[in-house]
Every structure is written in structure tokens, then in C-alpha cells.
UniProtKB/Swiss-Prot annotation:
Full protein name: Lutropin subunit beta
Cystine pairings recorded for this chain: C29-C77, C43-C92, C54-C108, C58-C110, C113-C120
GO-annotated biological processes: luteinizing hormone signaling pathway involved in ovarian follicle development
Organism in which the protein naturally occurs: Mus musculus (Mouse)
Keyword line: Disulfide bond, Glycoprotein, Hormone, Secreted, Signal
Length: 141
């Protein structure tokens, strides 16, 4: 009987040991490449470009008794260090600024969501798309 209990315990624990040795099941917060769209209502086309954004899993906690205590702030994957780059929208009429600037993630961290610099709305059901005709490629400055 003792041997059977030991075998059962080994069977229950062995998958978790294998999973733990491979690291987390979800990728942790880090810079990843993403394709974004840029447009201006006064310019005739929309362009797509690739930049790095912060994405990934941040450990979080949910209270067991949510009604008794205030909610726990949930951390999000956000910028630690960033730089800015720019693209030029082609075909803009004179007097319209054709330059669109965007952040480039250099490093990321888990922390509170700052609405001034981040979109904290969660995953999108539809990717960002252009309203104007799309011009493939990019023109980095």
C-alpha cells in the first residue's frame, strides 16, 4: 500500500516538475515585435510599420473575498525604457505634417497601468487596421 501511495504521488508530481523545469507556461513581460498602422485624415494613404512593444504575462492576484476588501491593483506589462522613432506618411498635401512618431520598447517591466502612456484595455478582438487605403512598407526617418 505504501508503495502504491508513493507511485501515485510520483505520478501526480512528475508533470509539474517537467513543466517547472521548462519555465513559465506564458511568456513573461518583454519587448516583442508588432506591426502597427499610421494614418492622418489629411493624407491619402495609411502605412504599416514594425516596432517593438511591451507584451507578456505579469503575475497577479485576485482576492478570495472581493466584497470584504478593496480590489488589488493588477500589474500590466509596460515600458521600462523607451525611445521614439518616426515614419513619414507619403502624399500629404503642403501644410500637413507627414511625420508620425511612435514609442519603441527597449525594456519592459510589470507595473501599474499609466493611462497617460499605455493602452490598458486588454487584448483586442480585431487588430488595428487602416481606415484609408493601405500602402505596404515603411518610410523610417
Amino acid at each position: 500500500m505504501e508503495r502504491l501511495q508513493g507511485l501515485l504521488l510520483w505520478l501526480l508530481l512528475s508533470p509539474s516538475v517537467v513543466w517547472a523545469s521548462r519555465g513559465p507556461l506564458r511568456p513573461l513581460c518583454r519587448p516583442v515585435n508588432a506591426t502597427l498602422a499610421a494614418e492622418n485624415e489629411f493624407c491619402p494613404v495609411c502605412i504599416t510599420f514594425t516596432t517593438s512593444i511591451c507584451a507578456g504575462y505579469c503575475p497577479s492576484m485576485v482576492r478570495v473575498l472581493p466584497a470584504a476588501l478593496p480590489p488589488v491593483p493588477q500589474p500590466v506589462c509596460t515600458y521600462r525604457e523607451l525611445a521614439f522613432a518616426s515614419v513619414r506618411l507619403p502624399g500629404c498635401p503642403p501644410g500637413v505634417d507627414p511625420i508620425v512618431s511612435f514609442p519603441v520598447a527597449l525594456s519592459c517591466r510589470c507595473g501599474p497601468c499609466r493611462l497617460s502612456s499605455s493602452d490598458c484595455g486588454g487584448p483586442r478582438t480585431q487588430p488595428m487596421a487602416c481606415d484609408l487605403p493601405h500602402l505596404p512598407g515603411l518610410l523610417l526617418l
